[in-house]
């Protein structure tokens, strides 16, 4: 998936800021093949491969456009990143970028901002956060670095991560049939950084 490559194979270099994606969400609109109305359908999401797109809708944020055609929109929201080593959420990233003194237009005009990386994160997938429309709401269009989850503040994603935690926990219990609830909770905290309220139900059912 393109999201996996953005996280593991790319870093973003803009005006002295190095951005390492940790959680990215795909937004694509093709009238015939993928009519996702959660996508803004902005002209900045078309035919601007490798360029930034600042937006104000919803919570606001920054996307990377990966469309190379006027026929479809495709961009990835940078939902969580490291910027010069500092963890930032979707709403924090634009403020940090604009604190450089450059304008949104300055950033959006930049080309060749994607550079090779070799991050080697463990990549997982889930649904997108806080969608306003039902289309593709159950599709696993988010890619995220699993190993980053317990290290940083991913509270914004906990609702979407519940199914990932459940699947991981069921596999863990199958591999450790004698494990206790306490051990399962400790494993959840180790891998995901928190323990959902439903862990007790999952363990005892």
Indicate residue ranges for each PLM-predicted region.
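Basic, alpha-helical nucleic-acid-binding regions used in initiation and control of genome expression
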Residues: 166-205
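A cross-family signal for N-terminal binding/gating loops and helix N-caps
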Residues: 1-171
């Amino acid at each position: 998936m393109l999201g996996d490559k953005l996280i593991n194979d790319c870093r973003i270099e803009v005006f002295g800021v190095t951005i390492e994606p940790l959680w990215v969400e795909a937004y694509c609109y093709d009238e015939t093949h993928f009519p996702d109305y959660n996508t803004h359908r902005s002209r900045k999401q078309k035919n601007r491969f490798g360029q930034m797109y600042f937006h104000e809708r919803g919570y606001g944020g920054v996307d990377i456009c990966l469309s190379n055609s006027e026929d479809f929109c495709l961009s990835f929201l940078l939902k969580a990143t490291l910027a010069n080593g500092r963890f930032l959420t979707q709403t924090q990233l634009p403020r940090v970028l604009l604190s450089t003194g450059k304008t949104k237009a300055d950033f959006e005009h930049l080309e060749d901002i994607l550079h090779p990386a070799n991050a080697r994160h463990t990549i997982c997938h889930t649904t997108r956060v806080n969608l306003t429309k039902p289309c593709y709401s159950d599709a696993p269009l988010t890619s995220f670095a699993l190993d980053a989850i317990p290290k940083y503040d991913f509270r914004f994603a906990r609702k979407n991560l519940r199914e990932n935690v459940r699947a991981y926990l069921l596999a863990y219990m199958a591999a450790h049939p004698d494990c206790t609830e306490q051990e399962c909770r400790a494993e959840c905290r180790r891998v995901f950084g928190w323990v959902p309220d439903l862990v007790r139900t999952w363990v005892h059912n």
